[in-house]
Amino acid sequence: MATATIALQVNGQQGGGSEPAAAAVVAAGDKWKPPQGTDSIKMENGQSTAAKLGLPPLTPEQQEALQKAKKYAMEQSIKSVLVKQTIAHQQQQLTNLQMAAVTMGFGDPLSPLQSMAAQRQRALAIMCRVYVGSIYYELGEDTIRQAFAPFGPIKSIDMSWDSVTMKHKGFAFVEYEVPEAAQLALEQMNSVMLGGRNIKVGRPSNIGQAQPIIDQLAEEARAFNRIYVASVHQDLSDDDIKSVFEAFGKIKSCTLARDPTTGKHKGYGFIEYEKAQSSQDAVSSMNLFDLGGQYLRVGKAVTPPMPLLTPATPGGLPPAAAVAAAAATAKITAQEAVAGAAVLGTLGTPGLVSPALTLAQPLGTLPQAVMAAQAPGVITGVTPARPPIPVTIPSVGVVNPILASPPTLGLLEPKKEREEEELFPESERPEMLSEQEHMSISGSSARHMVMQKLLRKQESTVMVLRNMVDPKDIDDDLEGEVTEECGKFGAVNRVIIYQEKQGEEEDAEIIVKIFVEFSIASETHKAIQALNGRWFAGRKVVAEVYDQERFDNSDLSA
């Protein structure tokens, strides 16, 4: 019987000679089979080959990038689907209301009461929205949210994006949970400088169709001496707020809106006085009052206290959207749990990071540079002045919950108690929050008592140097010079050189601020004492403490 020899190519090499090759001799009439353990690949000419064309394995970096891409794609897909479903749901509701307002072929028209309720609900939805224009192109949604959040909880921010330039078009719509928040934002944010520009805040263009209903709601609200209070500290209770505002008159009710899931208040509420003058005095005196490190936002209520007028909550999402969001969130959470376990095991492997969800930053890694977006103010330099602190060394009594183990915490507690005993004699130790929560306060001293209850703010470790250099004097050596000079007073975490333009004009003055972050507050005070009033290059330097909360929130404009 005739035989035939079949030479196979493996990894691009022709069999034969000294190169490794696979060959098989089979009878002419027999069916050839690949060796055991190999895969057969069908070629274009119909022939089979036993060679397995394997791709090179992915490197750890490539695997990590692939996981990031998958996670980011999932998040964007979920966000897109939810937005589309929400818009479709709202449009459907509006269509149903419009169709129900007229006589339909197979049904009855809405009753006058139902029609009025639908119109009011529509008016409330419009009252909750504000238009924000003249937004600097480098500012993103996070900056807008941070600027407008003090007035009340934000439901959504809609920024219009240019698909060609991939930048927003300079305007946005901010939707709050309650109309009073939008009204306060309209009154207090118009013409405020944000990112070097005076933003424009107004009502959406479609408010005209609902203006009669809005005027009617405002007229009904005047019958109640209610005020709206926002930016309330999370540690304050209804009774605390009531005791503060009782100084202006007798209060009929004081209620903070609460999250039904967590039971915590949402940072805003309503207070109703017995007299109209009391509400006017409270608004004029307490608006922008610093209570526990947060500036209260206080204004007149623009809607009557009727449960039927409560705006729709996010719980009105379509069931399909809610299910999709829950399933996707669970999947992402599971991925993060796996990534977190990997971080615990290696203490050096970066976790999966996405624009929306990030793992906790390991202790010992210097914080990211403060990229404040107050453009055209520009950060020209951020210099870490020392290497990262090893993970095994706790810094200033701060313990990262991801890396800390129970024995370590147990060892740190006695040390913390000893430090408190050394800092405060028994007669001078500050009262704890739990010891003060049952105190009774009222009248004009209530505000100070509540502030004392909340006064647990961390001392600032940031120093700002003003009037030190001109913009033209900034060079590559300035950061190093500042770091070296300030290093005489303590360990410098970082140095930020920030240029801030004082207007929108092209020739507007630019001032330079230099921010120096130390490891502890005592080093900051030592540096300020030494540098304040010192002359540098013919200029008298002004050294001051900078607010830690502003610095942590990337706000370098103060």
Swiss-Prot record:
On this chain, the residues bearing Phosphoserine are S111, S243
N6-acetyllysine modification sites are K250, K453
- Keyword annotations from UniProtKB, A to Z: Acetylation, Apoptosis, DNA-binding, Isopeptide bond, mRNA processing, mRNA splicing, Nucleus, Phosphoprotein, Repeat, Repressor, Ribonucleoprotein, RNA-binding, Transcription, Transcription regulation, Ubl conjugation
**What one GO molecular function would you report for this record?**
RNA binding
Q: Where in the cell is it found?
A: Nucleus
**GO terms (BP aspect):** alternative mRNA splicing, via spliceosome; apoptotic process; mRNA splice site recognition; regulation of alternative mRNA splicing, via spliceosome
- The superkingdom of the source organism is Eukaryota
What the entry lists under PROSITE patterns is as follows: RRM (PS50102)
- Domain named RRM: residues: 128-206, 225-303, 461-548
Region of interest (Inhibits homodimerization), ranges:
1-515
Q: How does it assemble?
A: Homodimer. Associates with the spliceosome. Found in a complex with RO60 and Y5 RNA. Found in a complex with FUBP1 and far upstream element (FUSE) DNA segment. Interacts directly with ERCC3. Interacts with CDK7 and GTF2H1. Interacts with SRSF11/P54. Interacts with ARGLU1; interaction may be involved in ARGLU1-mediated modulation of alternative splicing.
Family as reported in the entry's similarity comment: Belongs to the RRM half pint family.
- PANTHER family attached here? POLY(U)-BINDING-SPLICING FACTOR PUF60 (PTHR47330:SF1), POLY(U)-BINDING-SPLICING FACTOR PUF60-B-RELATED (PTHR47330)
Name this polypeptide is given: Poly(U)-binding-splicing factor PUF60
